């Protein structure tokens, strides 16, 4: 899990490159209720806090 202020680990990069398309199409969205932004993709599944306002993220169901 990527914590607040922590850079992504390089060990995720090879698998993230392969799985990014799958997670973007089929994966759940993660959104910030404070600034109303959302992310999809492999990297977003490992985010715990918003990069913009540092609010804890929630899963969004479409």
UniProtKB/Swiss-Prot annotation:
This is Uncharacterized protein ORF33. It comes from the Viruses. It comes from His1 virus (isolate Australia/Victoria).
